[in-house]
Curated annotation (Swiss-Prot):
Name the UniProt record assigns to this protein: Putative nickel insertion protein
Family matches, as HAMAP family: LarC
Organism per entry: Syntrophobacter fumaroxidans (strain DSM 10017 / MPOB)
Keyword Kinase tagged: no
Family: Belongs to the LarC family.
Domain of life: Bacteria
């Protein structure tokens, strides 16, 4: 799986993403040609080599003439009606949706009414759609990122003096691991944060992969300590095993009606939790208790924590980052004398291919056919063995 890792040691912005993708081999004429498929005009796109400190990278410049303000609804229409390829449209719209939802929360307006003002509107369109074009052209199948530095200070805007990071940036990074590196300027822009929020699958250290190429996108600020660059590593995921950085949230409960645990588990799974465990424990004062453990993607931290506090008697949770090493898997179907059933296939590093019947399908078929679920499992495994 071709993976891009965004190393945001100096933050991230839309133009830095474009610069890094060009540095990785995206031809400028391809980028320009694809952007012309959107019905916008009044800009000149260029790129040049620049240094930040001792490191050279690609800096993108977009010179924009006076532009009208554009609403999120209008921008979505422009992208949807363009001749861009479907994967590019989907990624672009996903990023703009994240951005519009964040701006809507900041200004307390419906997302469709969010306006991107004048130059900023076109700049966002070119940065976001350009990033989607670059990822598609380079064949990136998975995007991961480092922790994100927030920056600090204040900036003068048309809305007055605003704190940094911008309010929309903070909302976009909910559920994303962030940190303060002490630099008092804008490091992560709303556009950069929206790209990560919409497209990054995980955040943390570099995933296991064989690095094939590296690109540097140069930011507008001339800062060289640390160098104002976005580094993007592109490589192939290491064969056989996949590594994901996840969160483990747990809490110990000794005073809740046990009938409620089933409901709590359903709520957590509905929210997107990857796994939920209930572990018996002995607490202080020799009270029997339950340790509730939830495995989840970092982006779901806020939602899962809220469910735990709303649905249980917990007064606090423990949160830790964990690495999950897993076998690659895919879902298929097999034919049995009782009907079709889904199967989860995994491939081990030593070449073994294993099949696991999908429980819900087996349960449904067993009830429909009036046969023991054990027999359905046996038939599914036999069919899977014949199909290997």
């Amino acid at each position: 799986m071709k993976t891009a890792y965004f190393d945001c040691f100096s933050g991230i912005s839309g133009d830095m993403v474009l610069g890094a993708l060009l540095d990785l081999g995206l031809p400028l004429d391809v980028l320009s040609g694809e952007l012309k498929k959107i019905a916008v005009s009044g800009y000149v796109l260029s790129a040049e080599r620049e240094r930040r400190g001792s490191i050279a990278g690609t800096r993108v410049r977009i010179d924009i003439e006076d532009q009208p303000a554009r609403s999120y609804r209008e921008i979505a229409r422009l992208i949807g009606e363009s001749a861009l390829e479907s994967p590019v449209k989907e990624k672009s719209l996903a990023v703009f949706e994240k951005l519009a939802l964040a701006e809507a929360r900041v200004h307390q307006v419906p997302p469709g009414d969010v306006h991107f003002h004048e130059v900023g509107a076109l700049d966002s369109i070119l940065d976001i759609v350009g990033a989607a074009i670059g990822l598609h052209h380079l064949g990136i199948e998975r995007l991961c990122a480092s922790r994100v530095p927030l920056g600090g200070g204040f900036v003068e805007t048309r809305h007055g003096l605003l704190p940094l990071p911008a309010p929309a940036t903070v909302l976009l990074l909910e559920g994303v691991p962030v940190y303060d590196n002490g630099i008092q300027r804008e490091l992560t822009t709303p556009t950069g944060a929206a790209i990560l929020a919409a497209l990054a699958e995980s955040f943390g250290p570099v995933p296991d992969m064989v690095v094939r190429s590296t690109g540097y996108g140069v930011g507008t600020h001339p800062c060289a300590d640390p160098p104002n660059l976005l580094r993007v590593l592109v490589g192939e995921a290491s064969p056989g095993l996949l590594r994901r950085r996840l969160l483990l949230i747990e809490t110990s409960i000794d005073d809740m009606n046990p009938e409620f645990y089933g409901h709590v588990m359903e709520r957590l799974f509905d929210a997107g939790a990857l796994d939920v465990n209930l572990v018996p424990a002995q607490m202080k004062k020799n009270r029997p208790a339950v340790i509730l453990r939830v495995l989840l993607e970092p982006a779901l931290q806020a939602a899962v924590t809220e469910i735990v506090f709303r649905e249980t008697t917990s007064l606090g949770v423990r949160i830790q980052e964990v690495d999950r090493v897993e076998l690659p898997r895919e879902i298929g179907e097999v034919d049995t004398p009782y009907g079709r059933c889904r199967v989860k296939w995994v491939r081990t590093p030593w070449g073994e291919r294993r099949a696991t019947p999908e429980y819900e399908d087996c349960k449904r078929i067993a009830l429909e056919q009036g046969v023991p679920i054990r027999r359905i499992y046996e038939e599914v495994l036999a069919a899977a063995g014949r199909g290997q």
